[in-house]
């Protein structure tokens, strides 16, 4: 029974001791630590020290001297000590409760009430359903906007008079700038065309007036 409780002293070709199953370290963790120690090229003393710590179930040391002779001489420079890889150091990743409370981890989400329905409007809607059997939404009365009377259309005869006057003023301005010869023929042709249109309007209106007088 005693031989079964003991762990095999040495693994072939490695010099690593097998660790007992402790509460703090699972067999998978022990195997991972063996591999990491091998890759980190730790001395035999450092490996034995770490394995003994694991068998006791104690936390792994943050640093380990390469030999036992340096254990009793802490006054020497810290450069002689070999620091363990970060994965071999056991650090708790749990945050303290005070830090969680400061970050609001324990604070409850405030209740935000949703928009309530208009009870009076719902009451009127139900009354309308009971009275008429139909669900009709109340329509807001849109104020009637009075439309302004459109501006009276400018008489075509008056438009022609204004257009002729504008062309006369333009031609006078060009004459003052010494460019009247360039625009004179164009402006006079347009004025002549508009005068003929005015004569046509005058004859048509005179004819309509005579017809109206004849029927009375």
Swiss-Prot record:
Q: Which InterPro entries match?
A: UPF0193 (IPR007914)
Q: Which residues form a coiled coil?
A: none
- State the source organism's domain of life: Eukaryota
Kindly give the Pfam families that the UniProt entry links to this protein: UPF0193
PANTHER family linked to this entry: UPF0193 PROTEIN EVG1
Q: What family is reported?
A: Belongs to the UPF0193 (EVG1) family.
The name this protein carries in UniProt is UPF0193 protein EVG1 homolog
Source organism (scientific name):
Mus musculus (Mouse)
């Amino acid at each position: 029974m005693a031989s079964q409780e003991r762990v095999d002293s040495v693994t072939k070709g490695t010099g690593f001791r097998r660790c007992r199953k402790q509460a703090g370290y699972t067999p998978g963790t022990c195997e991972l630590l063996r591999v990491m120690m091998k890759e980190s090229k730790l001395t035999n003393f450092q490996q034995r020290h770490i394995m003994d710590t694991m068998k006791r179930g104690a936390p792994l040391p943050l640093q380990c001297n390469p030999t036992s002779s340096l254990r009793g001489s802490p006054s020497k420079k810290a450069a002689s000590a070999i620091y363990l890889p970060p994965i071999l150091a056991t650090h708790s990743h749990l945050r303290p409760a005070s830090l969680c409370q400061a970050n609001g981890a324990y604070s409850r989400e405030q209740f935000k009430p949703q928009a309530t329905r208009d009870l009076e409007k719902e009451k009127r809607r139900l009354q309308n359903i009971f009275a008429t059997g139909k669900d009709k939404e109340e329509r807001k009365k849109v104020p009637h906007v009075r439309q302004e009377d459109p501006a009276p259309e400018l008489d075509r005869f008056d438009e022609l008079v204004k257009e002729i006057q504008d062309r006369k003023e333009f031609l006078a301005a060009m004459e003052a700038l010494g460019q009247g010869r360039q625009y004179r023929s164009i402006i006079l042709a347009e004025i002549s065309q508009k005068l003929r249109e005015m004569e046509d309007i005058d004859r048509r209106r005179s004819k309509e007036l005579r017809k109206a007088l004849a029927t009375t």
